[in-house]
Amino acid sequence: MANQMALWLDREGAAEMSCIAGVGGGVISLVRTAQSRRPILALDGCVLKCVSACLSNAGVSADTLLVLSDYDVKKCKHADFDPVQAVEVYARAVLPAALALRGGDERWARAAATGDAPTDRVATHAT
């Protein structure tokens, strides 16, 4: 689910997705991108916080860390994530956090602070 949300952010132009496995694996160009001092939104799927660990290995910490299990997202083995839940968490937490890091318009900044995101920007993601 975290990967899908990162793709949505990238496709909407709200954030640029980067390969966290490459950062954790020490791929020079990806580590440089992570260390470039651009704001970083880390989307960790569960309490293991693998994204945070990969960033830490590169000497970087996220400006904003969202752990999807904090939003009642359960880890699924051998099954797809719940698309309805994904859209809901994306609209309520992920997109507002990304836009707040970018200095998004006032409505999105309020949404990030209250967790009450407008849904018009994510309607195309409902399946």
Give a label for each model feature:
Residues M1-H125:
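Iron-sulfur-associated redox domains of electron-transfer enzymes in respiratory
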